[in-house]
Amino acid sequence: YRAVHLNIPVTNKLVSIVGEIDHPLTVRVPLGTTVKEAISLAGKITVEDPAYVMGGPMMGRLGTENTVITKTTNAIIILPKDHHVVVRMEKNLDIEKRRASSSCCQCRTCTDMCSRHALGHPIEPHKVMRAVANHDLSDLSVFINAAYCSGCGICEKYACPQGLSPKSIIQQFKGGLRGAGIKVEKVEPAPVLEDRELRKLPVHRLAARLDLARYD
């Protein structure tokens, strides 16, 4: 707001520092501050071998002590390196594709819980997983519609009963579309699903599933 409407450049950012730390807090720090410097404001880390999640547990990425705060950084989550969230972020995508081939049961829960699908966008994660599992390129719209994925992570962090990674696979296709300069044609979205409100994910259940409720 200040940058757009008041012509004041963004030079600092509010960042929440939470997880395995003595005194979790939200603090305003200058852009370019390292993770190590920011964390020192919240006390001592309470685990010996920490991992640093930059952003949220659903859409964030792993960083290091030397990662710097940018204008898009909103949180640093300190977790043990063997924590479920960290392990999932370190997964090998080639292995995940092979797991899709062997384990995806086409229950379509990923699509049923997809927030973009519920809004009427033509993204169906279960069809992407089916195409990947069977090396099926007969319907390219399945892959092109990956562009409608918001990357929220509900499909792989909560919905999939097999613990597969639809979001990560879809994001790879989405990146490939951008890299190839392919622009997705605008389509008229389908109507919002009537039961969209019933498909929403309770935050407390998500926190419990991710083993993060203890940090609340």
Enumerate the predicted regions with their spans.
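Redox cofactor-anchoring modules in respiratory/redox and cofactor-processing assemblies
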Residues: Y1-Y215
